[in-house]
């Protein structure tokens, strides 16, 4: 059953599914490597390559640069609403985004005393009394 296909095929059935066409296409279209000039001859300047695989850093996308020492920054194009992260957004049944807000209980400083009575250091109301 393994060889139930064409008897004259040049390999396993899954070889046709791999990207071998892409490799042969790149080899045919690729620019031939420049010939090495003799040591006594001056080297001609290389013309700028329009290929996206050029080694100049200014032509590459900033997220594709490797070894820059800084992590790639995500683009802000995907609808970040008012600085909220995706973690804080909820999608309603209608498909709209709503911000999840945590309800916090107010903290009572010093076991029930009001902030004026608490006497915090650096309190601006402390000087007026």
Curated annotation (Swiss-Prot):
The keyword Iron does not apply. It comes from the Eukaryota. Residues 87-104 have a biased composition (Basic residues). Residues 31-50 have a biased composition (Pro residues). Pfam families: ATAD4. Keywords: Developmental protein. Residues 1-129 are annotated as: Disordered. The keyword Repeat does not apply. May have a role in proliferation and/or differentiation. Belongs to the PRR15 family. This is Proline-rich protein 15. It comes from Homo sapiens (Human). The lineage of its organism: Eukaryota, Metazoa, Chordata, Craniata, Vertebrata.
